[in-house]
Curated annotation (Swiss-Prot):
Organism: Staphylococcus aureus (strain MSSA476)
Single Gene Ontology MF annotation: peptide deformylase activity
PANTHER family: PEPTIDE DEFORMYLASE
Name the record gives this protein: Peptide deformylase-like
Family according to the record: Belongs to the polypeptide deformylase family.
Gene3D superfamilies reported in the protein's UniProt record: Peptide deformylase (3.90.45.10)
Length: 162
């Protein structure tokens, strides 16, 4: 549909909890398509509605081989005590990376574009992306969850050793 402009990191929409979707209609379908188009144009792994100035709990995640995950009003039902610490970043904060500890496995409840409830169990990288994007829709940037922010040299070393 359309590639949307990203809001800057200082935009107030990114500090507030996004509103729940109550109407599952064509405007939601357009928003999901706009998120997809914008995500791919930005070469991002995921994108949520507040990042394109829409205060709605709607997000999209590129799970590569598993396809595209659409999240509408997602809620974490359970998560493992076992955690993994890994590098995270955001297109909202370019060139900022941090080590974030997150649950290794989660169960998330969400809705599809038609308003049907779906439940998904996610592990490792996909679980991390879902937790990251839900935080973002709740006004919590990954930097608030980061154990530490990395220097440019540390980020380079991460990618060389990966």
């Amino acid at each position: 549909m359309a590639i949307k402009k990203l809001v800057p990191a200082s935009h107030p929409i990114l500090t507030k909890k996004a509103q729940a979707v109550i109407k599952f209609d064509d405007s939601l379908k357009r928003l999901l398509q706009d998120l997809e188009d914008t995500m791919y144009a930005q070469e991002a792994a995921g994108l949520c509605a507040p990042q394109i100035n829409q205060s709605l709990q709607v997000a999209i995640i590129d799970m590569e081989m598993e396809g595209l995950l659409q999240l509408v009003n997602p809620k974490i039902i359970s998560q493992s005590n076992e955690t993994i610490t890994d590098l995270e970043g955001s297109i909202t904060l370019p060139d900022v990376y941090g080590e974030v500890t997150r649950s290794k496995m989660i169960v998330v409840e969400s809705y599809d574009v038609n308003g049907n409830k779906v439940e998904l169990t996610a592990h490792e990288d996909v679980a991390r992306m879902i937790l990251h994007i839900i935080d973002q829709m709740n006004g919590i940037p990954f930097t608030e969850r980061a154990d530490r922010i990395l220097t440019d040299k540390e980020v380079e070393a991460y990618f060389i050793n990966d």
